[in-house]
Amino acid sequence: MAQHVNLQLGDKVADFACGTGGFLKSAYDVLAKQTNDGKVSDLQVLNSSFYGVEKKPLPYLLSVTNLLLHRIEQPHIVNGNSLSKNVDDYTDKDKFSVILMNPPYGGSELDIIQKNFPSNLRSAETADLFMTLIMYRLAYNGRAAVVIPDGLLFGGGNKRAIKERLLQRFNLHTILRLPTSVFAPYTSIATNVLFFDRLSKEEEQANKGWSTKQTWFYRMDMPQGYKNFSKTKPLLLEHMKDLEAWWNNREEIIVDGFPKAKAFTPDELKQLDFNFAQCGFPTVEEEILPPDELIAQYQAKRQEQEAIVDKALANILALINAKE
């Protein structure tokens, strides 16, 4: 994700649910390569580039430790709830040029937290609120990459309002559909990555329609030979080669009659009632045979297996008799 948000030295990078600081560390790895041979001013800029918030005490401590170990001498990590402030109270100084996040999903928030958001964007679901928070805290010309669950893609109600606002106010240029097991063994929830940018102040003020011109959807299929990812068989960089090749040379891809990559305009997505669950994973339908065909198949298979067993027994008996 950090490689696809055009990180530049001087960017202010934020993660409002930073966990152990993995995304901030990834951003550091990208920006550290842009420093000039240990130039003091570059290192000072680099050290002041990262901001994180973590609600839980243990991950908070681990995130601070993680950044310290990677030579970020003054980690700007806060132990708290990013959702506890009214989004209308944020000013330009509270906004960031890059936001990288994998917000918690499956959780729910109290009414007092939900009231910090506009009524049409309110939700008890934590991931929805973080998605709205990101839209309020991304600076002009800012870039964001956010992991979100499938529920937001096809959901209606407040989820629909969030998606419509995203297309109206931001350039939602890419949605990456991830395999279900990509975060195994930590979660089996199907996830996606949304990549979007905010326009410049001048462009935003002049814009009268959709800020998004088109949104590309790309389905990342399982590598050949893999049924799923796991702790012992994790997602590796080499598995991303097809995605990397496509990213800079985008074109529609059809596999076995199903779209793997395809672009949609905001008007087309509106006609689909803002259903972002496009270029999904094909489902293999199992053919259910009539009972007589199933019985016939079973009997044929049974006879085949019995013949194999009979042949093996005959060979064993022949060996025994030969020794006698």
Label for each model-derived stretch:
Residues 2-101, 106-108, 124, 128, ...:
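Conserved S-adenosyl-L-methionine
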Residues 79, 85, 91-324:
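A conserved structural/catalytic subdomain of Rossmann-like adenosyl-cofactor enzymes
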